């Protein structure tokens, strides 16, 4: 017997628990703080018995202030563990770079230079003098010194998925045909086409980011809230209250 999946329109959050799932932040501390203010205001005016704020990964790279984003998330989680913070491929890429200075990896090619700048390390200056390989080696040494241990431990501690009610949350998506509790961690932070092209319903509605869209995308089987915040200045989230679902946005300046 094939299990019938859950359609977005029928999906419900747990009774009495408000859910918020926030898309890729990429160094936009301003937008993350604005989204939290917006959610806090909502919870003040329409109190919920319980709530979870789920961050869908990619806190670092590209945008201007990755360091402050990580500081903000560490504080938020200390203040209330109902702030759930999932791993994205860029967050794992930063850990990988700190462990091994790969000159042509994700970090150096896709916005890690901006992350390093937020910690006071300037890769571009050294490239001018030394060429890439030497500049990366020097920058790597400086960055390992500059990134607080607490940030490294935090990045290492991030889970790859979480589920509440009829929703399954992860950074990139899932591999169709594989049970949700048996997903490969690489797929959860990297998958694109095999997931996006899948039209059938899943056992839960998948809420994800990773692949930027001009505005949040709601499909029968998934919701994508990555609205390219670092560049567009729009950070999006899915808000779930029982059977009621809506997309919320905060706006800042485009870069």
Label each region the model flagged.
Residues 1-34, 103:
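Short glycine- and acidic-rich boundary segments immediately preceding or forming the N-terminal edge
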Residues 1-8, 33-38, 67, 149, ...:
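Short, motif-level signal for alpha-helix interfacial/capping segments enriched in acidic residues
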Residues 6-15, 46, 75-78, 160-163, ...:
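A short acidic-Thr-Gly-centered motif at the start of a beta-strand
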Residues 16, 48-50, 80-82, 165, ...:
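A general structural motif
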Residues 22-23, 54-57, 84-88, 205-211, ...:
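Active-site neighborhood of phospho(di)ester-bond hydrolases with catalytic His/Asp-centered motifs
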Residues 26-27, 61, 92, 174, ...:
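Short, glycine/acidic-enriched loop or turn micro-motifs at the edges of active sites
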Residues 28-109:
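Core catalytic region of metal-dependent phosphoesterases/phosphodiesterases
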Residues 105-110, 116-117, 121-224, 228-234, ...:
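Acidic, His/Gly-enriched loop-helix segments that form or flank divalent-metal centers
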């Amino acid at each position: 017997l094939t299990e019938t999946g859950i359609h977005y329109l029928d999906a419900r959050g747990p009774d009495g628990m408000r859910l918020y799932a926030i898309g890729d932040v990429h160094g936009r501390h301003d937008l993350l703080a604005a989204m939290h203010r917006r959610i806090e205001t909502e919870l003040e005016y329409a109190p919920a018995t319980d709530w979870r704020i789920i961050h869908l990964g990619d806190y670092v790279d590209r945008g201007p202030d990755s360091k402050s984003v990580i500081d903000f998330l560490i504080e938020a989680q200390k203040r209330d563990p109902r702030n759930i913070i999932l791993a994205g491929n860029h967050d794992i890429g930063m850990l990988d770079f700190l462990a091994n200075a790969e000159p042509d990896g994700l970090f150096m090619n896709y916005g890690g230079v901006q992350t390093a700048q937020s910690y006071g390390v300037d890769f571009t200056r050294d490239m001018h003098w030394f060429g890439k390989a030497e500049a990366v080696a020097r920058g790597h040494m400086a960055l390992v010194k500059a990134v607080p241990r607490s940030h490294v431990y935090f990045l290492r501690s991030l889970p790859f998925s979480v589920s509440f009610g009829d929703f399954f949350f992860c950074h990139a998506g899932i591999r169709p045909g594989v049970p949700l509790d048996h997903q490969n961690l690489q797929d959860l932070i990297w998958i694109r086409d095999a997931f996006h092209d899948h039209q059938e319903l899943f056992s839960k509605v998948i809420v994800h980011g990773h692949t930027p869209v001009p505005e949040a995308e709601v499909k029968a089987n998934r919701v994508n809230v990555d609205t390219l915040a670092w560049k567009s200045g729009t950070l999006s989230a899915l808000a779930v209250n029982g059977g009621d679902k809506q997309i919320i946005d905060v706006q800042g300046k485009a870069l």
